Structure formats: C-alpha cells, structure tokens
Amino acid sequence: MMRTAKLHGAAFFLTLLVSVTLVSSSLASSDMSPERQTTMEAEISAFQSGIDALGHDWIAGETSRMRMTPEERRATLMHDLEPFNGDVGIPYVMTEDRSGDRSLLDWRNNGGNFVTGIQDQGSCGSCWVFGAVAALESAFLFAIDGGDVVNLNMSEQYPLSCISNGWGCGGGWGQNVLNYARNSGMLDDDCMPYQESDTVPCGDHCSDTQYRDYYYGNYGVVCYTANTTSIKNALLNYGPLYTTMDIYENFNSY
C-alpha cells in the first residue's frame, strides 16, 4: 500500500553554518582509557570555569559527546560546508501568530504524539539527514492525526546514499533531503537500514519498495536567520521543524 502525506507542515528554518544531532553513544566511562578519562575531566573543568566566568548558571558534565575524542566529535558535524545561499527558490511560509504567552509546547503529548524516537547518527556527519528525516516523520504523523503508525522509522540511509548534491558523512543541507522526499519519496528503515556510511550504493535496499514508499508535497522556509516569534509560530502551526544551529565546544558538555 502506498502511503502519501502532504508536507505542508514540515516548514524549516536555517540559521548558521554548523549543525549537530546529539547522538546516544554506547561508550561508557568504564570503556575509556585512563588517559581519555583524564583529558575529558580536564575539558569539563575548563568549560565550567568559562561558564562561571560569564555568570551562566548551567553545569558542564559528562555526556556521550564528551566521551568522544575531539576528532570524533568533529566528524559528526557539518564543519566545512560553503555558506548556505538562501535564495534557492524555496517559498517562505507565512505563519499565523498563535504564540501568545505560551511558554511550553510538547508535540509528544499535544492531542497525540507527533515525534518519533531518538536516533543515533554514529560516527558519520549525517546530522543534516537525521534532522530532515525527523521532520518528515513528524509531518507524516500530522497528516494522519498522530500516533496511528506504530514505531514509524524512515530510512536515513536512503537519502544519505542517493542524494548527489550533498557531502555524505561530510555534511549537507537538509533542504536537499526534503527535495528528495518530494521528488523520489522515502523508504522505511527496515527496507534500507542505516550503516553509518555514505559509500552504501543507492540501490542497496529491499525489492518491494512500491509497497513501502512515503511521498510528500511541498515544503517551505520560515526564516534563514533566527527569529524567535516566527519559529514559535511555525512550531505551533506546523509542528517540529528542521533547523541548523551554531555551536561552541562547551555545548558538548551540556
């Protein structure tokens, strides 16, 4: 059965040039070498000193990303891309002002569950794919009023392997994934499981794709630079968004 959804609800906004999808690393503290443990603790201490000096009130700590080496962290980021050119013919999305004084919105429990589970991009810098696919999944759940697809999980490997105008594990822009979903559809993860590699052939998927495709309509952009009001309105009107964000080193310890 072919599944279809209009992607009017997956508007995205683009901000700065580095994007990150936090990963759930299986590397526990006990698996690190004593040298790596010492280095990590020194990094966290230095981050905390900087946080305190600026008068901020959050505490740096051990996270899955802090357990990575600096080289491993860098490999998961979009770090060498050319600046994004916003003038690429993507229509702006006008959003109704519905934010009011609302300070909390959880699309996991807002008349249904419209958010899929946390994923792990591993050592591949494929955050640009994971963020966009998560928005596509939420758009599909919106189209069917949420929660009616058990364990919805679309394939990140499919666009990672098949999109030619990206840099694979070296990064890319999420609108390329949205374009691909609109023009070619999406497959589920069982049909083409994620392998943390951009060398997997595009055709290395299940044979019965005609029965497990997801097709989408158009998408739009909310803003290219951060605009809090527009983003809040878009979250209320359209649901979860694809975004990029600029990060600093201490973000890894948050």
List PLM regions with ranges.
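Short hydrophobic transmembrane-like helices used for membrane targeting/insertion
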Residues: 2, 20-23
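Bacterial N-terminal signal peptides that target proteins for export
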Residues: 2-12
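Bacterial N-terminal signal peptides
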Residues: 11-21
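Cleavable N-terminal signal peptides
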Residues: 15, 26-27
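Catalytic-core signature of thiol
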Residues: 27-254
